[in-house]
Amino acid sequence: MDMLNTLRDTLSSVQAELSTGVEKLRMNVSANIVAQQKVSTESVNEILNTSAGNELLQNFQNLITEVEENGAEGGRLANLCSTRMGRCQQMCKEKADAVMEIDEFLRNSVEFDKKIREINAQISKLTRFCNQTEQAMTYLEALCEVAHTEGEVDLIRQQAKSAATIVQIECESPSVLTSALRSRPEDAVKAQQEEVMLEEFLSSKNMQLP
């Protein structure tokens, strides 16, 4: 409020001084242009030499400087806004193109349905392949288990054969000893018979001698 009052007083003083200066100019008007310019210059200088005129001129200069600064800042912001608007326009164009492509794709329902059917067929093939792979893996696991079981059975058979061989040897050993024992008395009887036959032969020879 004080600033407005001060400005009003300043304008009033300037107006009064301008009126005085104009009256002086009217009184000193001459036909010579140079004289008029001289009078005008003197009047302006006289006005500027006053405190109110000097203050008003300073205010005008400050306002002009502020207007220039605001103009430069406005130009900078305008350039920045233009750059951002260009980017926004490019982004909107890309989004619009994408939306148009989606719209065109959705409008072509036949092609869309065809692609869905192709995808379903590929999924069915993949599912069948996975099932076949699972069955093959199960079959391979069963084969591995059978091979492992057969290996264990062969090992058991070999162990059984070895045990049977050992048992057979143990069973045959007493019969061999028994046969050996049985053959010994027969050999003794045979030897005794041979001795008797030899003695009879010798005795017969002795009896035939003169």
UniProtKB/Swiss-Prot annotation:
Disulfide bonds: none annotated. GO terms for biological process: endosomal transport; positive regulation of gut granule assembly. One of its GO terms (cellular component) is BLOC-1 complex. Belongs to the dysbindin family. It comes from Caenorhabditis elegans. The lineage of its organism: Eukaryota, Metazoa, Ecdysozoa, Nematoda, Chromadorea. Component of the biogenesis of lysosome-related organelles complex-1 (BLOC-1) composed at least of blos-1, blos-2, blos-4, dsbn-1, glo-2, mutd-1 and snpn-1. Interacts with snpn-1. This is Dysbindin protein homolog. Component of the biogenesis of lysosome-related organelles complex-1 (BLOC-1) involved in gut granule biogenesis.
